[in-house]
């Protein structure tokens, strides 16, 4: 713990904070330096060199303002650095909230978060990545303030959640899953009575509902102010109560996408990522049962049922947007809440010691699997950026060749001629070398 003074105020820096902060940057650079120090545009980037994409029209009334922090330009290093900073603060807040003191576990937490597939997907849209990860921070801060500030924490949490949703609505799911994790911790680790936990947790429900209502109110004012309506894109214009059949379909979509992002859309496959994530889910289940028995939570029926329900509801919470409109389609960009399952595993691993054989096996396997995931994710990040680089250069080469051939035609008049392109150019990335235009 280090202390320094700014004016008359003493600032305390805990070692745990510094470990989380530094790890985020080290692993973040290992995973994403390829992206930060190269210009790798995608389709959206071409017309968003100066901007953050659609804002008010998609209900993202704070996105434009959040993008101003790093200017309105697509700046890979600047936007990437701010993104890493936001993630590192998230790690610090969560280590405080869930009382993670073990430095090794903090390293794993930071490394998993910063290399998660949603972060890679966000960096594909680098012109708005920093704003999206600011939404991640605000959603986390909403739960943290509700937890630690007694008097005005819930209200402050509502404001943070509303602004997180004002950047990207999908980040509300981060707050939902964090509340579920805290409920699990209360029952399984702190061993609170059911009614006592309910009294304590009502403020989190108030924060979630209040934040959503505040977001909706500001959205309504924004729509009136600019005289616009929400489009049908992603079901944004059709939010509301659905039919029972639609809720069933939403649950099916949720379970499919939950398996998909973990690499298990067709069950456990012979792929490293699929096997590692299957091991994570298995270990979470085994450690959860072990803690229920060891801490005698099973003697408190309501507490046990509530903790089981909270675990089962994690996928629903992570994909809650599915249950607000039948037209929602989830993308990796929207799935940051799923990475919190690894936080749940870390929280439970901290309750295991190295004394009994079963505890040793569970803890050792858990640490090994998480280390494997970090390694795999870092490699996978670089592979993703490598493919982005190939795709970009391939596209540029094809476009230049087409343009040259057009300009060589006798009918070509000037640069203002319009060109109609019909058909498809067969140039899959894996065939890059043999499909280059000649």
Where are these regions (language model features)?
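Short hydrophobic/aromatic helix or loop-helix immediately within or flanking a transmembrane segment
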Residues: 54-77, 81-85
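Membrane-interface alpha helices of multi-pass inner-membrane proteins
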Residues: 153-169, 174, 180
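Signature aromatic-anchored transmembrane alpha helix within multi-pass, membrane-resident enzymes
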Residues: 154, 277, 351-380
